[in-house]
From Swiss-Prot:
GO annotation, cellular component aspect: ribonucleoprotein complex; ribosome
Family recorded in the similarity comment: Belongs to the bacterial ribosomal protein bL20 family.
Gene that this sequence comes from: rplT
Keywords assigned by UniProt, alphabetized: Ribonucleoprotein, Ribosomal protein, RNA-binding, rRNA-binding
Function field: Binds directly to 23S ribosomal RNA and is necessary for the in vitro assembly process of the 50S ribosomal subunit. It is not involved in the protein synthesizing functions of that subunit.
Species annotation: Xylella fastidiosa (strain 9a5c)
Biological process terms in GO annotation: ribosomal large subunit assembly; translation
InterPro entries: Ribosomal_bL20, RIBOSOMAL_L20_CS, Ribosomal_protein_bL20_C
GO molecular function: rRNA binding; structural constituent of ribosome
Name of the molecule in the record: Large ribosomal subunit protein bL20
Pfam families, sorted: Ribosomal_L20
PANTHER family documented for this protein: 39S RIBOSOMAL PROTEIN L20
Amino acid sequence: MARVKRGVQARRRHKKILSLAKGYYNARRKVFRVAKQAVIKAQQYAYIGRKQKKRNFRSLWIVRINAAARINGLSYSRFMNGLLKCGITLDRKVLADIAVHDPAGFTALAEKAKSILAA
C-alpha cells in the first residue's frame, strides 16, 4: 500500500485557521499554533456574546419602559401588572419601541393600566 502524505490537508487546515485570524496582531495572525488558540478563544467569546446580547437587550427594554412609566406616574412593575390585568399582551421589545417613538401611545397604555389598578 502506498504511503499517504498529509501535506495538502495540513496546508488547507492551516490556511483556514490563518484566514479566520485575519485582523489579529503579530503572531496571532502569522503563527499557526498561536493563531489557532486565538481563533478558538474568539469563537468562545462570540458564542458567549450571542447569549449576552439577548440579556442586554431585555434589560435595555426594561430600562426604557421603566423611564416612560415613571414619567406617567407608575413604576415598571405596577405598569406591567396593570397591562397584564387589562389583557394587553405586548412584549417588552414592542413596549420599549412605543415608549421611544410614540410617547402619546405609551401614555394611553399607562392610563389604561392606572385605571385597572385603581379599580
